[in-house]
From Swiss-Prot:
Organism: Danio rerio
Keyword Repeat on entry: yes
Keywords attached to this entry: Kelch repeat, Repeat
Protein name, UniProt field: Rab9 effector protein with kelch motifs
Pfam families, per database record: Kelch_KLHDC2_KLHL20_DRC7
Job of this protein: Rab9 effector required for endosome to trans-Golgi network (TGN) transport.
Length: 351
């Protein structure tokens, strides 16, 4: 097993190294297809410089079934917590998002359960009534929702709008639907606006990530084919464009994950024709250039169907009362192609 060092609370991580986070308390079991989201502390906690926020892990699955529970890493106490939230319909390979108008909320769409795909939307509001029991509410949507599908992302939201393109039907098959679906979290309405340009072919296991007002789609698979292409959708003009990328082009890959930082997209892991990978690539949106990132020290095991989020990590500065913030990529769980499923927490600095 690789010997990846543990990053302690407020310790400064080095660039080009992987670390393990080991929160205390009862960690989740091994899982695939969950989502990870960082939620900042509510403003009233921030006046004293406290309030590091929390990472919320929702749903997922392993051979024992799909999950209706959520786990929290409380970054102030560096502890796992299993909150008393009820009402989530069990799902994995779903999508999670936080609308701009409700920063203290978490919404989910789609995903799969044992025998069926979901197309429902549920929302959990942290602003509801103090620290008491909270409930996932099923959102009564208007308009025509997409068909049930897997759609594994936590970064497909621009403002208050979630953008849904393609997704998984069953097994290695993508949905046949080539329509763009847009969910407005304020009006709770689904629409299917017309687009122009060249859309991607239908696929599942693709990365969908927002950078400014653009949505980027990378990779994915359909049948036996692994895609290596990248497309952008301008969410204002609704025009698709194929990206003419340069640099270290990633191979065809599916079930990878992404985070965005400073107009750069970072992808890690996924399944390629050669099996699960542990490579990380950076895409500079302004230069349209890919770079394969090089690391020192041990690397995490290759994995797919994990989830990642951007983690603002507070670092205690010597001779100072103030903390510096470094932005980390946080990775949880996933599996390799030999059937080993993970429940580890990994981080690396994004530069």
């Amino acid at each position: 097993m690789e010997l990846i060092p543990v990053l302690e609370p407020e310790q400064k991580p080095q660039n080009r190294h992987w670390y393990v986070l080991e929160p205390t308390g009862a960690a989740p079991g091994v899982s695939v297809g969950h989502t990870c989201s960082f939620l900042p502390a509510a403003h009233h906690h921030d006046e004293d410089g406290g309030g590091k926020g929390k990472i919320v892990i929702v749903g997922g699955a392993n051979p024992s079934g799909s999950f209706a529970d959520s786990y929290i890493i409380n970054l102030d106490t560096h502890q796992w917590d299993l909150p008393d939230w009820e009402g989530l319909q069990a799902r994995y390979e779903h999508c999670s998002f936080t609308p701009e108008s409700e920063p203290q909320s978490l919404w989910v769409f789609g995903g799969a359960e044992k025998s069926t795909n979901r197309n429902c939307v549920q929302a959990l509001r942290f602003s509801d009534g103090g620290e008491g029991r909270r409930f996932w509410q099923s959102v009564q949507v208007t308009g025509v929702p997409p068909s049930g599908r897997t759609y594994h992302t936590n970064s497909a939201c621009v403002g208050n709008r979630l953008f849904v393109f393609s997704g998984g039907e069953a097994g290695s098959s993508a949905v046949t639907d080539a329509q763009l679906h847009v969910f407005d979290a304020v009006s709770v309405t689904w629409t299917q606006p017309d687009t122009t340009g060249t859309p991607p072919a239908q696929r599942h296991g693709h990365v969908i990530t927002a950078v400014g007002s653009d949505i980027y789609i990378h990779g994915g698979m359909s049948g036996e084919k692994f895609h290596s292409d990248m497309f952008t959708l301008n969410t204002e003009s609704l025009k698709w464009q194929k990206v003419k990328a340069k640099g270290d082009l990633p191979p065809g890959v599916a079930a990878h994950s992404s985070v965005t930082f400073n107009k750069n997209i970072f992808i890690f892991g996924g399944m390629t024709a050669d099996g699960a990978t542990n490579s990380m690539f950076k895409f500079q949106c302004d230069k349209q250039r890919w770079t394969l990132l090089k690391f020192e020290g041990d690397l995490p095991p290759g994995r797919l169907d994990h989830s990642m989020c951007l983690l603002p990590w507070r670092v205690k500065m010597e001779d100072s009362e103030h903390a510096d913030v470094q932005h980390l990529c946080f990775v949880f769980g996933g599996m390799d192609t030999q059937g080993v499923i993970f429940n580890d927490c990994l981080v690396t600095v994004l530069t």
